[in-house]
């Protein structure tokens, strides 16, 4: 599977890369804006943090296919091999199709339905990113949507994969993996929730106390 961090915080990427076997970093316009850095400054720093083997994702801003393609080429020139995120609108689908012919790898983003995700895959997107928690917030069932999308891609677009996004809890991420997703991207707070395990800390403290009571120190 492929595990990504959804952030533009270079320091946190460097810290968590020591702990998680991350495949790379995903960003979006809101994440980059929150960093207060120019995208052209932060992307090289993120690439350096994840190494040459890591995959970096960045999103276009244009609303029309021509503009999306031009921005995608600019991103690819700046960071060779970057995966360009394209919103799955009508214009976005046209852009994905054109970029496929140009050899630029894309991710169909802002996916709120299985049918929308399937269209992105059929247009040529390597990755499709369903927004799990945002679907839930609108009264839908994000996990069920991911399950449906995963099945559709397996049957009709096997060269594409679900990269599930928009999580508020580790449980949502695990449910996507159980549905067969081969890739997920975690916000920093959800990644940290996976590491914060009070019961484990309590068990370790008990081990240490028992050892110290018996041997007077914490050395092997």
UniProtKB/Swiss-Prot annotation:
Q: Which residues form the signal peptide?
A: none
| Catalytic residues as annotated in Swiss-Prot or TrEMBL | 85 (schiff-base intermediate with substrate)
Known EC number:
4.1.2.-
Tell me if Transport is a UniProt keyword of this record.
no
GO molecular function per UniProt: fructose 6-phosphate aldolase activity
Sorted UniProt keywords: Carbohydrate metabolism, Cytoplasm, Lyase, Schiff base
A biological process (GO) of this protein is: fructose metabolic process
Instruction: Write out the annotated subcellular location.
Output: Cytoplasm
A GO cellular component term found in this entry reads: cytoplasm
Q: What is its main location?
A: cytoplasm
Q: Which reaction does it catalyse?
A: beta-D-fructose 6-phosphate = dihydroxyacetone + D-glyceraldehyde 3-phosphate
Its quaternary organisation is:
Homodecamer.
Name the family: Belongs to the transaldolase family. Type 3A subfamily.
Q: Which HAMAP family does the protein's record reference?
A: F6P_aldolase (MF_00496)
Q: What does this protein do?
A: Catalyzes the reversible formation of fructose 6-phosphate from dihydroxyacetone and D-glyceraldehyde 3-phosphate via an aldolization reaction.
| NCBIfam families from the UniProt entry | fsa_talC_mipB, PRK12653.1
Output this protein's name. Fructose-6-phosphate aldolase
Task: Look up and give the organism this protein is from.
Answer: Salmonella schwarzengrund (strain CVM19633)
Gene it is expressed from: fsa
């Amino acid at each position: 599977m492929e595990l990504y961090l959804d952030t533009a915080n270079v320091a946190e990427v460097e810290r968590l890369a020591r702990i998680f076997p991350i495949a790379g970093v995903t960003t979006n316009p809101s994440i980059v804006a929150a960093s207060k850095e120019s995208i052209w400054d932060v992307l090289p720093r993120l690439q350096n943090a994840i190494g040459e083997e890591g995959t970096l994702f960045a999103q276009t801003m244009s609303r029309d296919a021509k503009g999306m393609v031009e921005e995608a080429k600019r991103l690819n020139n700046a960071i060779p091999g970057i995966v360009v995120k394209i919103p799955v609108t009508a214009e976005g689908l046209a852009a994905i199709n054109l970029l496929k012919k140009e050899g630029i790898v894309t991710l169909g983003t802002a996916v709120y339905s299985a049918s929308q995700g399937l269209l992105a895959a059929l247009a040529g997107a390597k990755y499709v990113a369903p927004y799990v928690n945002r679907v839930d917030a609108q009264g839908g069932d994000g996990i069920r949507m991911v399950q449906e999308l995963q099945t559709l891609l397996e049957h009709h677009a096997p060269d594409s994969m679900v990269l599930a996004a928009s999580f508020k809890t580790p449980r949502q991420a695990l449910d996507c993996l159980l549905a067969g997703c081969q890739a997920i991207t975690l916000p920093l707070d959800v990644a940290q929730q996976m590491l914060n395990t009070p019961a484990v800390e309590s068990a370790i403290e008990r081990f240490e106390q028992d050892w110290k009571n018996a041997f007077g120190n914490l050395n092997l």
